[in-house]
Design a protein with these regions (language model features):
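Short, Lys/Arg-rich, polar N-terminal cytosolic tail immediately upstream
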Residues: 1-15
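A structural signal for multi-pass alpha-helical bundles of membrane permease subunits
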Residues: 15-305
């Protein structure tokens, strides 16, 4: 009896193990096929000269050396991307926080506005929205029409002007503030109302409450949003490709767009792979810097004095 019970238990355990492997199998296959193997392959290709038509030729560090010594457009793309990140990320986070604080109020219309404000985050990366944005900022677009109606004469093409083209991409990025806004809103609702009541009793006004209570207690959420938005900012691609295609005069040639051109425009897969690894390194360094600095500005509830 004991042996049969033990055998049945072992058989059941074995069946559960097999079912576990069966359920994890599709994820594992996808992970290996679309993440792990391409990850390793791109690292290997970064040391080769490969154009997809012939076998890869090992060139050592030649791709990396060329990037920093001979390719002027590489440095241009890097500069444009840094400028984009420095402009777009703080503005998007500030705008998202302001809207989140407005939507924190109890109102029957708040759920409706949450959906409306979140829609750009879903639609903003689509081709249709990018084409619409291109029309809005064109010479005969909606923006110039509105400015002319207000008596401000404007007939410039915002996306073709080297001084304003990057700002058109920045504004589109800011417009997609729904995701960080919802995260901020969730964090704001976790702050106890008793803190604000105590501050009011002490005579603290709204600005003082914001800087002494809201901002410190929201700093972990700000930290999370900053990291996620920074990573997304460094990888911005589709909007730049569809709206400006890197122009005018490479003023909107972001890093990911230049990487795409090298890899799939000029078929320099080895060079493109090397660029991808440099981008990964840049994102890793900046993420590490944010993590290292977090001890100085990220506070938790038990640290607030």
């Amino acid at each position: 009896m004991k042996r049969s019970a033990g055998s049945a238990l072992a058989a059941r355990q074995q069946l559960q193990n097999r079912m576990g492997y069966l359920f994890i199998g599709p994820w594992l296959i996808c992970f290996l096929s679309f993440t792990a193997i391409p990850f390793v392959a791109s690292f290997a290709l970064s040391f080769t000269d490969y154009n997809m038509l012939s076998a890869p030729v090992f060139v050592g560090l030649a791709n990396y050396i060329r990037m920093f010594t001979k390719d002027r457009l590489f440095m241009t793309a890097l500069t444009v991307t840094f400028k984009f990140v420095l402009l777009a990320i703080p503005l998007r986070l500030c705008f998202a926080l302001v809207v989140a604080m407005i939507l924190k109020r109890d109102s029957k219309a708040v759920p409706f506005y949450r959906v409306i404000y979140y829609l750009p985050s879903i639609l903003g990366g689509s081709v249709a929205v990018s084409v619409m944005w291109r029309y809005v900022f064109s010479k005969t677009g909606v923006l110039n029409t509105a400015l002319n109606a207000l008596g401000i004469m404007s007939n410039i093409s915002w996306i073709s002007n080297k001084d304003t083209a990057l700002w058109s991409l920045v504004l589109l990025f800011i417009w997609q503030f729904g995701s960080p806004m919802l995260i901020f809103l969730s964090g704001l609702k976790q702050i106890p109302a008793s803190y604000y009541e105590a501050a009011e009793c002490d005579g603290a006004g709204k600005p003082r409450q914001f800087f002494a209570i809201t901002l410190p207690l929201l700093s972990p959420i700000i930290f999370f949003n900053l990291v996620m938005q920074m990573i997304g900012g460094f990888m911005v691609f589709s909007q730049a490709m569809i709206i400006t295609d890197g122009g005018p005069m490479n003023k909107t040639l972001v890093y990911a767009l230049y990487l795409y051109r090298q890899s799939f425009g000029y078929y320099k897969m080895g060079y493109g792979s090397a660029m991808a690894w440099i981008l990964l390194l840049i994102i890793g360094v900046f993420t590490l810097l944010v993590f290292k600095s977090s001890s100085a500005w990220v506070f938790y509830e038990n640290q607030i004095k």
